[in-house]
Amino acid sequence: MTMPKIMILPDKYPCSITSILITSRCRVTMYNQKNTLYFNQNNPNNHMYSPNQTFNEIHWTSQELIDTIQNFLQHLGIIEDIYTIYILVS
């Protein structure tokens, strides 16, 4: 099994996350500022930000963004290659 495809639009760094769009053949889910992007408080492996800090307040580098999105997807149970993940940044 391979991981989902992750696309970052536009591809610029440092950046802040505006929205995360998760798509598959039968499902589309969007995370944005309205339904604030909080990461799992119980994830002790991520030391880049405090557990309750929103994604859009962080100025990401390329590798930090990819690593954190992969952790976020695993937290959501999205680990199959049937998904495409679009990360909209500003």
From Swiss-Prot:
Keywords: Host cytoplasm, Viral RNA replication. Its main location: host cell. It comes from Human respiratory syncytial virus A (strain A2). It holds the Pfam family Pneumo_M2. It comes from the Viruses. The keyword Cell wall biogenesis/degradation does not apply. InterPro entries: Pneumo_M2-2 (IPR009969). Belongs to the orthopneumovirus M2-2 protein family. The keyword rRNA processing does not apply. This is Protein M2-2. It is found in: Host cytoplasm. Mediates the regulatory switch from transcription to RNA replication. Acts late in infection by inhibiting viral transcription and up-regulating RNA replication. Inhibition of transcription by protein M2-2 requires phosphorylation of the phosphoprotein. One of its GO terms (cellular component) is host cell cytoplasm.
